[in-house]
Amino acid sequence: MAQVPAPTQTTNLSPALAATISEAKPTPKDAVPNNSELGSLLRQEGFGVVKLKQENLGNRKAPKNNPKHLIIDAEVNRVSASLMVDTGTPITNIARDRLEKFGVVEQKTSHRVTSPLESASNKRRRWGASFLAATFYGIAKLNMLAMGNCVIQDVPVAIDAIPYVDGVLGSDDMHRIGAVVDCAKPALYYAPRGPRSDTSRKLETMLQNNGFTQVPMRLTSNHCLEVACSINGVPSTVIVDTGSLATCVEKSIGIKAGIIMKHTRTVLMGSGGASARIRTGRVKQFAISDFEIRDANISFVDLKNVDHPPANLLGIGELVSNSAIIDVGGLSMYLRHY
């Protein structure tokens, strides 16, 4: 979920539809040298790097210090594409209105795009009927998806109504290429050979020596990246979601933690056109595993749909302000106070 309409997080495609990965020779224009210790280590381990852009999707007039989405320049079926880097979405998504551009044929399904947010039929005028009418997702297979020098072939994707970008790069494909995402100095590092435990151990040692705190991630049953957290001592879990601008917690946790929540005019938009108004509150102690953030401004949302378990989200704003480095392949996140 995000504060702009976001693609579904609940697409489930068969794991048998595996992708093959190869390394292309030409150096793309967006592959840039990185002189940091992180870049040096990963280059020694055979990684490539693609810089990421930070963009205000749907709100070009937003203040400069507002959180921004991470965008990667990629190629879909040899056609240039802009994809949102979204660790909160397992399956890579392609926007339904870009199918002709990429020569992709959608296979319709009877599976609804679902969201824990309440129905947003009254928001139809705000975002446009065409977006909210698309409540079913389709599936397709890309011939190729290229990022930097890394080419993934035969890529299963979901098809959904996605505004502003050509699609969403999901965490499953990031895992396939052993991706390491630097949120504060936006870059995506990739290993065409895939994730390796020895590289993750070297990365852990280097980052901890530089003052980072390791936060173990767990892969949930629906392939989301989850970490332990607590709100003023109240334990919970949160999804690491670079596709969400805000860090959002279920309202009942805020009540239990004694948070004073203020109403806002901001609407959180979820998949399938669902929406909910958010409240904000100042949390004295927001702990992400062993990493503690003091006086954090958190958004609280009332998740009314009991068919889906509450999904608290650790959004890109909090990730950037705490210098997050996400080792998707190694299932670890590293945080350091900015």
Where does each model-flagged region fall?
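Pepsin/retropepsin-fold aspartyl endopeptidases
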Residues: 1-338
